[in-house]
Structures are given as C-alpha cells and as structure tokens.
Amino acid sequence: MSFDWTPEELQKVVDENKIVIFMKGTPDQPQCGFSARGAQVISMRATELGMETFASVNVLSDPRARSALKEWSDFPTIPQVFINGELIGGSDIALELYESGDLQNMLSDDSNASE
C-alpha cells in the first residue's frame, strides 16, 4: 500500500478497512518483534473468526511515515492497530485484548463493516 501519508489518506485507510495495522515491515516479513507480535495476534483472531485478511501498512516504506502516523494518531509507538476505525494501541494491548477475549468481541461487532 503506497500513499502520501497525509492525515486524510491515513484516515481513509482506517475508514475503509475493518482491521488495519501500521507496522514495521509486513505480516509475512516483519522488521521488528513488536510488529511481528501485533500482526500475529491480529492474524490469529481474524482467522478464528473466518476473516481472510486485514490491511497492513509498512511504515518503513517512506521516511515520512513514522512521524506522520505518530502525529496523526497521537500515539507514540509502532505498531498501531486500528479496529472498526478506532486505535486500540500497539502489540501489547492487542495481546491483552486477545487473551481477555475482548479482541474477539471487537472483531465480531459490526462484522459487515468494510474488510
């Protein structure tokens, strides 16, 4: 996925996808442990719910990406996981939500949203 890292484009990708993870690398080739864990947690839960995919955006693809994302989301770390248009946090928070069962509830809600 390639774009100009404007607030409008960041908002658009979040609005158009039920699940988005902004990460270092890709789910298949993560470039940091936190991004790998975040993608793995989201992938496990999505698979369990029969969802085929989620959107991922590689913040290493452009030198402007990390600062633009952090400024837009007002969240200091990468990865950043968005579900149903809302920032839920990074990999630690995604893992906590997975372990508590709350992630399943979040993904089950409004299952007809854009995927």
Where do the protein language model's features map onto the residues?
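Flexible, polar/low-complexity N-terminal or interdomain linker segments that lie immediately upstream
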Residues: 1-11
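Non-catalytic, surface beta->alpha helical segment in thiol-disulfide oxidoreductase systems
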Residues: 83-115
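Thiol-based oxidoreductase modules, predominantly thioredoxin-like and allied folds used
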Residues: 25, 48-66
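Thiol/disulfide oxidoreductase modules built on the thioredoxin-like
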Residues: 70-77
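Local sequence-structure signature of Cys/Sec-based thiol-disulfide redox active-site neighborhoods
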Residues: 10-51
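Beta-strand cores of modular interaction/reader domains in eukaryotic scaffold and signaling proteins
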Residues: 20-22, 55-56, 82
